[in-house]
Amino acid sequence: MKNIFMLTLFILIITSTIKAIGSTNEVDEIKQEDDGLCYEGTNCGKVGKYCCSPIGKYCVCYDSKAICNKNCT
C-alpha cells in the first residue's frame, strides 16, 4: 500500500512539473526499474523510450530524447 501511495505521489509531482502537455509531449509511461538504475538519458519502455527523471527506481519515459531535453530542463 505504501508503494502505491509513493508511486501516486511521484506521478502527481512529475505531471505537475511538465511545462507543456500536447500529443507529442505526453509521458509515454512510467517504468519501475528492478535494479534501481534509472537515470536521465537511459532508454526505458517497450520500444526504447527515453527516461527523464533523477537517479532512482522510476523512469518517466518520453517518445524521444528531444522531448526529454525540452521537458526536463
UniProtKB/Swiss-Prot annotation:
Coiled coil: none
Organism classification: Eukaryota, Viridiplantae, Streptophyta, Embryophyta, Tracheophyta
InterPro entries with a match to the protein in the record: Amb_V_allergen (IPR005611), Amb_V_allergen_sf (IPR036712)
Endpoints of the signal sequence: 1-20
Name of the protein described by the UniProt record: Pollen allergen Amb t 5
Subunit (UniProt): Monomer.
Annotated TM spans: none
Disulfide bonds: C38-C68, C44-C59, C51-C61, C52-C72
Keyword tags: Allergen, Disulfide bond, Signal
Propeptide, residue positions: 21-33
Keyword Signal: yes
The keyword Metal-binding appears for this protein: no
Species this protein is from: Ambrosia trifida
Gene3D superfamilies (UniProt xref): Amb V Allergen (3.30.160.80)
SMART domains, per database record: Amb_V_allergen
Domain of life: Eukaryota
